Amino acid sequence: MPKIDGVTRTLGRLLEHLHSEGHEAIVFGPDTGLKEYLGHPVVGTFGIPILVYPGLKLNFARLRFIRRLQQFRPDVVHFVDPIWLGAQMIPLCKRYLPNVPRVSSYHTNLPTYASLFGVGFLEPAMWSLSRYLHSQCDMVFCPSESTRRMLQSRGIQNIEIWGRGVDTDMFTPEARVV
């Protein structure tokens, strides 16, 4: 994944696991120039840079996303931290893939970030949007019990914990640098 952060690391590890188990996946997201990851196709889309958060863009759904999804015939559609692109894709998936289960994963407390970036007045609206989008999914995954409690306090339901653990190949006592 070109952008390195907690969300892309988690997505990368998920794709590595799916690949190692022989599962197929397709990734839709920002156009980074990446066309595949471990043999999984990556379909990018245009985005407008967010000035207060370098490296992040507001991306737009494309009709070819739905066509590619229909051709791919997924068993499940996973929305990673759905806010902007997820808000566009969830209704399209409900319409064009009505029998395919939808799951989402919660990674970033974006509503709280609004306050940190000086637009705290957006926090209630962002929680409302987040609650609505996650409610359109059959299951919501989050990384910890404390995150689950926070999401439940905000009205988000059907939450399961998807623990991340530690990559013991990368983080070992032998690889320690003093």
Where is each model-derived feature located?
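Nucleotide-sugar donor phosphate/pyrophosphate-binding loop at the beta->alpha transition
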Residues: 101, 110-132, 141-142, 168-170, ...
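Helix N-cap/beta->alpha junction signal
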Residues: 81, 108, 144-145
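Carbohydrate-associated surface elements
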Residues: 31, 146, 165
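A short helix->loop->beta-strand "cap" motif at the edges of active sites that frequently abuts
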Residues: 96-102, 156-157
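A short beta-strand/loop micro-motif in the catalytic core of glycosyltransferases
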Residues: 135-144, 160-161
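Short N-terminal targeting/anchoring amphipathic segment
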Residues: 65-86, 100-103
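N-terminal subdomain of nucleotide-sugar transferases
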Residues: 1-44
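A short, charged, and often flexible helix/loop element on the N-terminal side
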Residues: 39-67, 79, 118
